[in-house]
Amino acid sequence: MDVQVYLINAFADNKYLGNPACVVPLQNWLSSEQMLNIAKNNNVAETAFFIKKENYFDLRWFTPDIEMDLCGHATLATAHCIVKHFNYSDKIIKFKSLSGDLNVSAVDGVYHLDLPKRVPIKSELPEYIYQSLSIKPKSVLKSRDYVLIYDSQDQIEQLSINRILFDKINLDTGGVVVTAKGNECDFVSRFFTPQATFLEDAVTGSSHCSLIPYWASILKKDKMIALQVSERGGKLFCINNLERISVGGSAMTVSKKKMSL
């Protein structure tokens, strides 16, 4: 049996920027073990698997390590795959996932993800994570992810992590996002996951489920532009809605191949 694997860069219109995700269309679900092995073989942060139903798509996400409950950039990549490679003409792509119903709108090459809002609350950081940070945060919040607040974009860009200490903690599907006001945008961030194959994520849609409501309350605005200042980097168009958030960005297909199982 062969499967088709699309490599798609999300939150970028350049193959050297954004966050690469693999997208695998299926007729029926493979076993979780098979999908995890495919994700390991793909060697990118996330692989999305989808099945077309009558008027929606079932969607699951795997890192090389575990199945995730939500992945924004791989959802955006999947929407792009469906529109560009499966002649899908509806303006709204509907997904069903472990995080419930997710809708993506496609307008003029920009994909807007409708995602659940995760308002972070004040918290304390595990000591190993705190000690692993080269620059200490001024405050700590938590939702699914730990959200660390800093004073400047320079601090976010200069931050380094002692992985020996950082990897002493397992956050399951969660991670650590560091954030500050941006110099030429509303806010910036970076995202790290302990004990993961990839320490830093290039662009993370799901972390903005927490970042958007936080910065909306700080900046007193509901429409914002964010940059994830990883090595590859990416731009996100952010909207804070009443109960959910919207994250928008571009995508491009880099390659496609067949994989034998």
Task: State what each model feature region is.
Residues 1-70, 76-261:
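Active-site proximal loop and beta-alpha junction motif in alpha/beta enzyme cores
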